[in-house]
Regions:
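Hydrophobic faces of well-ordered beta-strands that scaffold small-molecule active sites
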Residues: 1-2, 21-23, 57-61, 88-90, ...
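Active-site beta->alpha loop and helix N-cap motifs at the rims of alpha/beta catalytic domains
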Residues: 39-100, 105-113
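Conserved, mostly hydrophobic/aromatic
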Residues: 13, 92, 123, 165, ...
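Glycine-rich, proline-tolerant flexible connector loops at the mouths of alpha/beta enzymes
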Residues: 22-40, 61-67, 250-256
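Active-site-adjacent beta->alpha loops and helix N-cap segments on the catalytic face
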Residues: 35-43, 93-99, 136-149, 253-255
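Conserved small/polar residues in nucleotide/adenosyl-binding loops
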Residues: 274-278
Length: 278
């Protein structure tokens, strides 16, 4: 699943061999104020381009939603349903519930921080796909997958819940993106789609009492290393991951195409290797 923030990136994702893309429109998505976004008027064209090339389209509606946002939330999901978007990616029960009520398919966003099978059982009534918390290790992911199979945890379609995980890109320093740095520094809430990436800046560290600057090995002390799983995708598949998501809706089309191509090739190689082992 490739990230798309412009028509150029959409075409790059298609050329790179994406099986699906995810994107946002004006509001209520986690990049609504920190990167380029489409508008409601773009939905039909995006869906048409995706269908023409045999890929699925997923619309993010995954910010914190306040009472005053409910009319906009319904308007966005109505537009998604009318344009026949494949699914919305949601993190608020209000959005999930409304989407279900009008027959719009839902995927569970990583913003929900689903990190165990019991939480997944609760949310399974709303969605057929879950983007698990990024903080999980492969052993924990496999345990959730085992519970899905053993307990027959199914979504609205009556099929077993499918696991989706981020496979490549920037990682938030906060748990599942619930960060307040942008709000503290610039009065811009990351939880409302306005992450200013404060954590990815270089910092010096001083002792407040002595005013002595500490000697640190890496100035990027609040920025985790970017995620890269291309060298163990076979292990992710064995753990039950079925959808590999690339971070980067704010990235340019060159990045989108290159990373999508690399991961598509890696998926094919892993599948071929699995078949050979069998």
């Amino acid at each position: 699943m490739a990230p798309v923030g412009s028509y150029e990136s959409l075409m790059a994702a298609i050329q790179g061999g994406a099986d699906s893309i995810y994107f946002g429109i004006e509001g209520l998505n986690m990049r609504s104020r920190s990167s380029n976004n489409f508008t409601t008027d773009d939905l039909r064209k995006i869906v048409a381009l995706c269908r023409e090339h045999g890929i699925k389209s997923y619309l993010t509606v995954n910010t914190v939603i306040y009472g005053e946002d409910l009319p906009l939330m319904r308007e966005i999901i109505d537009a998604a349903k009318e344009a026949e978007v494949s699914a919305i990616i949601a993190a608020d029960v209000a959005a999930m519930n409304y989407a279900n009520s009008i027959g719009q398919e839902v995927h569970l966003s990583t913003q929900l921080n689903i990190s165990n099978a019991e939480a997944l059982k609760f949310y399974a009534r709303f969605a057929d796909v879950v983007v698990l918390a990024r903080e999980l290790n492969l052993k924990q992911v496999h345990e959730i997958y085992r519970q899905i199979v053993d307990q027959q945890i199914t979504g609205p379609k009556g099929e077993l819940i499918r696991i989706e995980m981020f496979a490549h890109g920037a990682l938030c320093m906060a748990v599942s993106g619930k960060c307040y740095l942008s709000l503290h520094e610039m009065n811009a809430s990351a939880n409302r789609g306005a992450c200013m990436q404060i954590c990815r800046r270089a910092y010096s560290v001083k002792d407040k009492d002595s005013n002595i600057e500490l000697d640190i090995e890496n100035q990027y002390i609040m920025s985790p290393k970017d995620l890269k799983t291309i060298h163990f995708m076979n292990k992710m598949m064995d753990a039950g991951v079925r959808v590999f998501k690339i971070e980067g809706r704010a990235r340019g089309p060159e990045y989108v195409r290159l990373v999508t191509e690399c991961y598509k090739e890696a998926v094919r190689a892993s599948v071929s290797y699995t078949h050979l082992r069998a």
